[in-house]
Amino acid sequence: MEIFKTAFLMVALMLVFIAVGGYVGGEQGMMIAFLMAAGMNIFSYFFSDKLVLKRYNAIPVDENNAHGLYEIVSRLTQKANLPMPKIYIIPEEVPNAFATGRNPSHAAVAVTEGLLKILNENEIEGVLAHELSHVRHYDILTGSVAAILAGAIAMVANFAKIGTLAGQNQNSQRNANPVIMLIIAVVMPLAATVIQMAISREREYKADKGAAYLTGHPEWLASALTKLENYSNSYVMQNASEQSAHMFIVNPFGSLTSKLSVLFRTHPSTSDRIAELQRLEQEIKRGM
């Protein structure tokens, strides 16, 4: 069911992009929009992992200098039948983690120093199982495409507004319509953001479920989320960006976004995630 929901949201996002491109430049605008999206998606496919790891100054580690962490990842990948990903530690005291990479064969998982300090081994395993579930279901690629399309829609909408104000658009009479301009300049980018956030939230629930069944202990991840949420409500990660916030296991901006409408959250509420994990715990126990 989650796959169909995500597919529907991705199609909706693409339709918003087509609508904006078509209004701005007609058939030519649609073609340009598709070419832009294709170019950005290709770039993201091959380089987004390197860019995000560099942004957070992630340091590669192996079994020699991070034996415990390496052992946990190795054990989980064997259980999940996944290739061993590259492992990184981020020099950051705020506890958090993310996965990146275009597919399971080119994946990386990164955790902050703060996470390794405040979580016990079981909780760390729960977090890493969550991240490996993202890898297993190609969530990184899905999230990257959604983020790029949403950004492209905002950019094209801004061009439309500038072009109309400057009177340079050949379809100036049509574009001058204030209602249509409001839709292009405000409503369309807003709709794109809402859809992007919905995709992100759906994938978080799916990764939580994957972690629960991979470890067999949903309570490990639930306990980790409780600690991470408590810490993130008091501190914000250095270099945190809105573009990559959806990648982390908890929002790196913490309480700064807690009062926003649910439509604009990159993650489901932690209380909802924990409640679902508790339900899964009972489900797993009944199946034993």
UniProtKB/Swiss-Prot annotation:
Cofactors that this protein relies on: Zn(2+)
Textual note on the cofactor: Binds 1 zinc ion per subunit.
Active site: E131
Cell location: Cell inner membrane
Transmembrane segments: 6-26, 28-48, 140-160, 179-199
Lipid bilayer topology: Multi-pass membrane protein
GO cellular component: plasma membrane
Database matches in Gene3D superfamilies: Metalloproteases ('zincins'), catalytic domain
Biological process per Gene Ontology, one example term: proteolysis
InterPro entries linked: HtpX_protease, Pept_M48_protease_HtpX, Peptidase_M48
Positions annotated to bind Zn(2+): H130, H134, E204
Known EC number: 3.4.24.-
Keywords attached to this entry: Cell inner membrane, Cell membrane, Hydrolase, Membrane, Metal-binding, Metalloprotease, Protease, Transmembrane, Transmembrane helix, Zinc
EC top class, as a word: hydrolase
GO molecular function, one term: metalloendopeptidase activity
Family: Belongs to the peptidase M48B family.
Name of the protein in question: Protease HtpX homolog
Organism: Campylobacter concisus (strain 13826)
